[in-house]
Amino acid sequence: MTHPKILLRQASATIFSALLPCLGGHAQDRCQAFNLETLPKREVRAVWLTTLSNLDWPKGYATTQEGIERQKRQLTEILDRYAEANINTVLFQARVRATTTYPSALEPWDRCLTGQEGRAPGYDPLRFAIEECHKRGMELHAWLATIPCGPWTSLGCRRLRAKGLRLRKLDGAGYLDPSDERVAPYLASVCAELTEKYDIDGIHLDYIRYPDGWPRATRRNGDTPDYRRANINRIVRAIHEAVETRKPWVKVSASPLGKYSDLTHYSSHGYNARDKVYQDAQLWLKQGWMEQLYPMQYYRGNHYFPFVPDWVANSHGRTLASGLGTWFLDPREGRWTLADISRQMEVSRWAGMGHAHFRSKFLIENHKGIYDFEQRFNLFPALVPAMKGKRDDRLAPPTDLRLDSGLISWQGDAPYYNIYVSDHWPVDTDNPANLLLARFAHKQIATALAPRLFRGWPFVAVTAMDRYGNESQPLQYQPPVATTYQPQLPKNLYLANDGQQLDLSEALRPLLPMDIDRYAVATLQGVFLRSYLRPLQATGPAQRIDISSLANGVYWVYAHNKRTKKMVRVGSFEIDRQQVGFVR
């Protein structure tokens, strides 16, 4: 029998070799023509929203009612931008440096909200953020910086020392000592308070490690690398147990260093999670102490790509999201190109990982076009992967699905519902192109809020979803006209092609000045096959897209309006390569 470690190495090598076509100099050209058949229905699409030093939010202090409203408005504008890009997970910094952005019985307020440590802002920012994320179908994970405690003289740091916890001073800042056996239960109590008080979807642990600059393990008095890993493991396990016993659907995750350890053919160059900062992150997944990992893969080239399959091969069936160094797109921070990030997003998706941007500011400010790319990359909504091995046995499909007087309604006891629409019946709920609304917390919606309905998308299906992310079987709605409904292909919408290229100029003429940023091709049954960026030559007779990879048959063509965020069907075409020249 082959040893399990050999099988893992073989799996890693297979994945890495399959990724090679996307790693060359022209990878962006090859990888941006997204194959819509491979778009995942489930995937983490996350952003770290930093409150430390007001880096992402808030901008301005809440010392008056006007200041409170300004902070709320800023946050909702950020969340709207996330929703428009089909982001589904917000990592909201709730514990900053032994200080909080929520009212806590254990730790003081952070200064980012009012400009003063320990001063309440007059509202609960975390509760507000949770409510606003949930309105938009997004999860909110409370992001905690675990070991760092801020400047040595700061209020949070002084409070921890007053509690009797052991801290070490490094470069003027305080850090909890992981070897102090009181640290694990204390941090677990912080997470327990959060879990009990708030409807959070996850606890996200940052800096769950020995800090850079900590004295090296001397091996004296038992201070060995294994001892240090055991100290961090003790904290992780205590937090997991505190959360699991209260709300088992709350996902515990962490952001370890982006390289777990040295690989057979690729070195971590002395900086990795396991051996440098004592994060045995792959063990956390194996033991079930973590449901998700967000490795901070803030590297390029051979410092990034070989380590993707290593994480995947050792995920133990749990969820991974590649942490992206999006801030390096800012010329003041680094010299990364859009292709550096877009290749990583393509490769991590192909390997089965989601992605997370560090940090919010650089994504929504669209540095080098990264926000535009994010919108194209996330063409459809996606569900967060279901938790491994957990399910609510009471989960049942919704009932009594009705469409009356411009209102879609149904009955059920689930906390969330997913709504699918299509121009084909029954609606294929495995196809992400049909997902209209994810993680919807109500039992009715006005069709005016779902513009695809009754505009060529007459069929509806609804599934129930439990807190663990599991879906029920769909409840399908078939209008009375469904038995006779067939897509009609008006003659004036047939588009010319030669089996290799499709001419779009005629179809787009009546739509100009429509702000089109991409096209898509679908089967007549509504299954999207490929997406294309807008051709470089945006006007004139050369408005063509490559259809050489499509089989003979008849297809729909859609154009995406960047301004209105809607897909518009612009025509159909038939591929018949037995004919010569452009055909209709």
Q: How should these model regions be labeled?
A:
Residues 42-44, 50-72, 141-193, 197:
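Active-site-adjacent "subsite" loops/lids of carbohydrate-active enzymes
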Residues 73-99, 198:
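Catalytic domains of carbohydrate-active enzymes, especially glycoside hydrolases
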Residues 189-190, 196-306, 310, 314-317:
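Active-site neighborhood of glycoside hydrolase catalytic domains
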Residues 281-282, 289-302, 321-389:
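Substrate-binding cleft of secreted/luminal carbohydrate-active enzymes
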Residues 406-414:
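Conserved aromatic anchor
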Residues 451-471:
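Beta-strand-rich modules
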Residues 467-484:
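Extracellular fibronectin type III
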Residues 485-491, 504, 552-584:
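C-terminal tail/sorting-segment detector
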